[in-house]
Amino acid sequence: MDWFHCNQCFRKDGAHFFVTSCGHIFCKKCMTLEKCAVCGNLCKHLALSDNLKPQEKKFFKSPVETALQCFSHISQVWCFQKKQTDLLIAFYKDRITKLEAAVKEAQEMAASQNKELSALRKENGELKKILDILKGSPSCYYGSRLTTPRPVGITSPSQSVAPRPSSHHSSQVVSRSSSMESIPYTVAGMGHVEQGSRGLHVRSTPGDSYTETPSPASTHSLSYRPSSASSGQGVSFRPFFSGDSGHTRVLTPNNSGRRESRTTPESLPGFQLPVLQTFYQQRQMGLARKDGWNISR
């Protein structure tokens, strides 16, 4: 220690030195018991030896050594604190990672639920519209049942209806088939055509044919003229006595439906006006036909 010396005589060598409470060092020769020789203050003194306490020895050690010891202690303290800090940071990092994963999962779930909610709202709106429509007109829900086509029973083509004489000078023999496009029919007319007492017996099989039967209350005698072709031609008939004597009704069957048109009698080929007959002539002709029928049988 280069700095160690007596503050009174400035000696460096010697075996006994004393230090006062006021911070002065004296050798054994310069030491006074009551007052400090330098500052003159009352003080206590302590003999320097190897038995000093640690807090007293540190004042006589080298500052570099003291600094190294302090730095070593500081380094240990710093390493310990840094280790604890690293553990705490690692814990927070792991917790942040878990929280980020939980937040991401929650965001995905929220997006999925929002999409599902939008779909449910859309479906709910459509169902509300349908419900409003059904509340407004409940018959539309069952309307399709009213328009359902019903099956029609049709007899076999082999079955036929036998001809029978009619009280109004007309009879019909109808042979039905399973399709409207293959219905043959025979019309036996008892009308009086061209001043003769002949019965007109017509049989034709158009693609879509049908027969008209005069009502019992009618006084018409119908004469049917089938066309030569199987389809697309008209079947005309005309009344002989009363009613619509000025026109001839032309019935034209086809595959798609029935058409009915009216033409003037003069436009038809071979048109002849009906001949009015008296009740006596009609009766005589009816008896003649009846006799002819019996003979033919």
UniProtKB/Swiss-Prot annotation:
Gene Ontology MF term list: SUMO transferase activity; ubiquitin protein ligase activity; zinc ion binding
Cellular compartments annotated: Chromosome
Catalyzed reaction equations: S-ubiquitinyl-[E2 ubiquitin-conjugating enzyme]-L-cysteine + [acceptor protein]-L-lysine = [E2 ubiquitin-conjugating enzyme]-L-cysteine + N(6)-ubiquitinyl-[acceptor protein]-L-lysine
EC class (word): transferase
Primary location: nucleus
Pathway stated in the Swiss-Prot or TrEMBL entry: Protein modification; protein ubiquitination
UniProt-listed GO biological process terms: chiasma assembly; homologous chromosome pairing at meiosis; protein ubiquitination
Mutant lacking the gene: phenotype: Homozygous mutant mice are apparently healthy. Both male and female are infertile and show synapsis defects specifically between the sex chromosomes. Most of the metaphase I/diakinesis from mutant spermatocytes display univalents with only a fraction forming chiasmata. Similarly, pachytene oocytes from Rnf212b-/- females lack MLH1 foci and metaphase I chromosomes have no chiasmata between homologous chromosome pairs.
GO terms under cellular component: synaptonemal complex
Post-translational modification: Autoubiquitinated.
CDD domains: RING-HC_RNF212B
InterPro entries to which the protein is assigned, alphabetical: Zip3/RNF212-like (IPR042123), Znf_RING_CS (IPR017907)
Keyword Zinc on entry: yes
Superkingdom: Eukaryota
Composition-biased stretches (Low complexity): 163-179
Coiled-coil boundaries: 87-136
Keyword rRNA processing appears in the UniProt entry: no
Region (Disordered): 152-179, 198-269
Subunit note: Homodimer.
Its biological purpose: Ubiquitin E3 ligase that acts as a crucial factor for crossing-over (CO) formation during meiosis. Essential for normal prophase I progression and for ensuring appropriate CO designation in meiosis. Recruits key components of the cross-over machinery either directly ou indirectly, leading to the activation of the MutL-gamma complex. The function of RNF212B in CO designation is dependent on its catalytic activity.
Designated name of the protein: E3 ubiquitin-protein ligase RNF212B
Organism of origin: Mus musculus
